[in-house]
Amino acid sequence: MALTESRRLYQQLAAELKQRIENGVYPVGDKLPAERNISEEMNVSRTVVREAIIMLEVEGYVEVRKGSGIHVISNQQRHLLAANGSDADFLTAGPFELLQARQLIESNIAEFAATQVTRQDIIQLMEIQENARQEDRFRDSEWDLKFHVQVALATQNSAMATIVEKMWSQRIHNPYWRKLHEHIDDKSIESWCEDHDQILKALIRKDPYAAKLAMWQHLENTKQMLFRATTDDFEFNVDRYMFAENPVVHLDHITNGKL
């Protein structure tokens, strides 16, 4: 199957899989082929396959059952998605596209914040972390959002905070991210608070390289957790569609173990 660039790859793949389901190639009650096989047949990455499957889940065609596979539960779309207004592009973006964008942008924001952060910024970040720990759950916590926005505010540039808040809010409004998030357990989410501690420590030291690495690693951990939570058929070493190695990822060589 040759996928063109007129639409996002995961949308093209989802359309092909939906057509097969509707035509009875994959009947209701059966399972889709393993993600590995879909990836090889369609000549796309595993990330693209995962996003396409999430889209099919949201629209009601399939159900992903951990340890069991991808089950076809309907041969017609059950849920219609509305993507209107200024956020339409965000609403149709794949969850891993959004995560990659956040990783690239927020790691650089954290780096700059370390050069501009004030004592008051540090106090506010410490208070946010304290409040986060007092909650009985960290899933969709307001303190998670506040932490990321406060890091951006520490740049002393309000536009940075607006960008971060708008991107972060897609975790609530993007239907594909919400579906993906349902598969994550609360214990895994608690590790995000520990990641925030590492970012805060770097900001306290006013170490831009360490702050950039800590934010990058935080979102890298999130990506790995999301993959582990939603598939039994994933080998990151063979997936170079997104999060491929580039100069940003090599910060660990620059910091020489400062974190």
Curated annotation (Swiss-Prot):
What Gene Ontology molecular function terms does this protein carry? DNA binding; DNA-binding transcription factor activity
**InterPro entries cross-referenced by the UniProt entry:** GntR_C, TF_FadR/GntR_C, Tscrpt_reg_HTH_GntR, WH-like_DNA-bd_sf, WH_DNA-bd_sf
State the UniProt keywords alphabetically: Cytoplasm, DNA-binding, Repressor, Transcription, Transcription regulation
**Which locations, inside or outside the cell, does it occupy?**
Cytoplasm
Which GO terms of the cellular component aspect does the record hold? cytoplasm
Cite the PROSITE patterns for this sequence: HTH_GNTR
Note the DNA-binding span(s) on this chain: 35-54
User: Which stretches make up the HTH gntR-type domain?
Assistant: 7-75
The reply on keyword DNA-binding is yes
Q: What happens when the gene is disrupted?
A: Mutant shows constitutively high galacturonate uptake activity under inducing and non-inducing conditions.
Q: Give the function comment from the record.
A: Major regulator of exuT transcription.
Q: What protein is this chain from?
A: Exu regulon transcriptional regulator
Source species of the chain: Dickeya chrysanthemi (Pectobacterium chrysanthemi)
For this protein's source organism, the top of the classification is: Bacteria, Pseudomonadati, Pseudomonadota, Gammaproteobacteria, Enterobacterales
